[in-house]
Swiss-Prot record:
It comes from Emericella nidulans (strain FGSC A4 / ATCC 38163 / CBS 112.46 / NRRL 194 / M139) (Aspergillus nidulans). GO terms for biological process: negative regulation of transcription by RNA polymerase II; pericentric heterochromatin formation; rDNA heterochromatin formation; replication-born double-strand break repair via sister chromatid exchange. Its main location: nucleus. Residues 109-428 form the Deacetylase sirtuin-type domain. Residues 1-106, 445-595 are annotated as: Disordered. The lineage of its organism: Eukaryota, Fungi, Dikarya, Ascomycota, Pezizomycotina. This is NAD-dependent protein deacetylase hst4. It comes from the Eukaryota.
Length: 595
């Protein structure tokens, strides 16, 4: 006989806590099942519990108790949920135009007030401004530009009888021809003299003021006259460093302030006397080096030629790497304003810089890009790059901005006045009279009724139940007396013989037929019914009588032999009465069935 299997011992069930009973109250108890079950049937082994927990917990996750997940803290003690940052939508951009050209000697731009406010507020309030300037900002100082009708390209062509444009005088090929070299030397010498005699304009001082206020992030200039760098706030560094820090002014095409040797790259201050000759001057550093080598018995390496440190067409810019680093750093800094002034943007590198800065600045909600020149920008790539196109002279822009000079550090002073000074000013100006008209007050109707009491107490309610209040409108009279007096004072009616006309009865409007819709959001009215159409009566139709139960549902007889096919009229009777129909004779074969 096989030994009897014993059930594993189970631990006594713990008493449920109030929290556990609340969560398990919806579960069925063992007594609710139809079949008898023992308490041992609800006991599980440790392996079964681990298998059930693995089904609930996915791989890589674990269930935490309330104490573990919240660190034993209640919901009120937990930190508030992190709010999401609201990102504003892109600002709607449109290009505005401002015309500052002189109008018959008048300088009133009242009809362009929004554009003027945008121009002035940008220059006065923005903190990270980038300016890209051309030769147009120096024309007021007496320095000619390049591409205008009176520019250098036109004048040099006529002066030196050049077959091509005067642009050839700024090409690197000038040192390959002796005649072009002589013309180039003369041009450089004259430009240096004009730059030395000129002084900064109002627009230059405005830029310097922005620099002294630390609101000018960078000034990219294409000029070689060096007027900007003559002011300390706009000083530059030659040569530029590849890494930061960089100066505030970046000279994209060099300057006439320096000259450099084409061989040893020796750089020194520009000397006009050395260029007062048809050929290029020799480098003094190369002369000393060559003399030392000759005295020591070494072979000569040659003597280099000096030239102004400016960038000509078809040659490499010595500061190209440093300028590229500065441009990339300024684009990453995300300026809030761009001013392109006095340039036609014919240089490809400058065009790329303007496009990159415009896209970055206009992505900012408060970013503003401005173009200041006598002509609009050329090319479809600049059609949607600027918020404001200013047509006019940049000197007028500086006058409208009304910024102090860069070297004017005086602060606005407010004089303190004593009472004696105030009386003196009053005596000088005379008595002041201010007429103040009082507005008409609207009449307020007096309240004749009883006011609602502000508060109610039990004592007041008891007193109100015992005492009666008199109506002030009755003036101490009773209600019956008032009614009798109103009947006596009633106006006399007219004689009974004259009858008043009966009031006109309102005729019901005829229902209008459904209107026809001919076009979208347009409804045509239905035509009115004429009296002739109203007189036409509809034909009266007899009512359809219901068939009695068991009657044939078709017009033809069910069996041809059961009834005669004669059109005899049925006896007249009342509608709704049943009639008995019997045949005159019995059909063949029916008698046998009946028997």
């Amino acid at each position: 006989m096989a030994p009897r299997k014993t059930k594993p011992a189970t631990k006594p069930a713990a008493k449920p806590t109030p929290a556990s009973t609340a969560t398990t109250s919806s579960c069925p108890s063992p007594k609710s099942f139809p079949i008898p079950m023992e308490v041992d049937d609800f006991s599980f082994s440790d392996s079964e519990l681990s298998d059930a927990q693995s089904l609930i917990e996915p791989e890589g996750f674990s269930l935490l108790s309330p104490d573990e997940s919240s660190g034993g803290r209640s919901q009120d003690e937990l930190p508030p949920a992190r709010k999401k940052r609201r990102v504003a939508g892109p600002k709607e951009r449109r290009t505005q135009h401002l015309d500052l050209t002189p109008r018959l000697g008048f300088s009133d731009y009242g009809d362009q007030e929004p554009q003027l406010n945008l121009l002035v507020n940008t220059i006065r309030n923005h903190k990270k401004i980038v300016v890209i300037a051309g030769a147009g900002i120096s024309t007021s100082a007496g320095i000619p530009d390049f591409r205008s009708d009176d520019g250098l390209f036109k004048t040099l062509q006529k002066k030196h009888n050049l077959k091509a444009s005067g642009k050839l005088m700024f090409d690197a090929a000038v040192y390959q021809d002796e005649a072009l070299t002589a013309s180039f030397q003369e041009m450089v010498r004259s430009l240096s003299e004009e730059a030395e005699k000129s002084s900064p304009t109002a627009f230059h001082h405005m830029l310097a003021r922005l620099g002294s206020d630390n609101r000018l992030t960078r000034l990219y200039t294409q000029n070689i006259d060096g007027i900007e760098t003559s002011m300390p706030p706009l000083a530059t560094q030659i040569p530029l460093n590849v890494k930061a820090p960089w100066p505030r002014t970046i000279q994209l095409h060099g300057s006439l302030e320096k000259m450099v040797c084409q061989k040893c790259r020796h750089m020194s201050t520009f000397d006009r006397v050395m260029f007062d000759r048809p050929d290029a001057p020799e480098c003094p550093e190369c002369v000393l080096t060559n003399q030392f080598r000759m005295e020591t018995g070494q072979r000569s390496h040659g003597i280099g030629k000096m030239r102004p440190r400016i960038v000509l067409y078809n040659e490499h810019n010595p500061d190209e790497e440093a300028i590229t680093s500065v441009m990339n750093a300024d684009i990453r800094s995300r300026p809030d304003a761009l001013i392109v002034v006095g340039t036609s943007l014919k240089i490809p590198g400058v065009r790329r810089l303007v496009k990159s800065l415009c896209s970055v600045i206009r992505s900012r909600r408060n970013g503003v890009t401005m173009w200041i020149n006598n002509e609009p920008p050329s090319g479809k790539e600049f059609e949607d790059c600027f918020d404001l196109l200013v047509k006019g002279d940049c000197e007028e822009v500086a006058r409208l901005a009304q910024l102090k000079r860069w070297d004017d550090d005086s602060k606005p002073i407010f004089d303190e006045c004593q009472s004696a000074d105030v009386e003196r000013v009053k005596n000088e100006q005379g008595p002041l009279s201010v007429v103040i008209t009082t507005p008409k007050k609207e009449k307020v109707q007096a309240q004749t009724g009883m006011l609602t009491p502000s508060s109610s107490y039990d004592g007041d309610v008891e007193n109100a139940s015992t005492t009666t209040l008199s109506n002030p409108a009755s003036k101490g009279r009773k209600l019956t007396e008032i009614l009798k007096a109103s009947k006596k004072d009633a106006p006399k009616t007219e004689s009974a013989g004259v009858k008043k006309p009966a009031p006109r009865k309102r005729t019901k409007k005829e229902p209008v037929k459904n209107a026809k819709i001919t076009t979208f959001s347009k409804v045509t009215k239905a035509q009115k019914v004429t009296p002739e159409e109203k007189s036409v009566k509809l034909e009266e139709h007899k009512a359809m009588h219901p068939l009695p139960p068991g009657a044939a549902r078709t017009n033809a007889p069910m069996l041809p032999g059961l009834a005669k096919d004669d059109s005899k009229s049925t006896p007249s009777g009342k509608r709704g009465q049943l009639e008995t129909i019997s045949p005159d004779r019995i059909p063949k074969g029916m008698g046998k069935l009946l028997d």
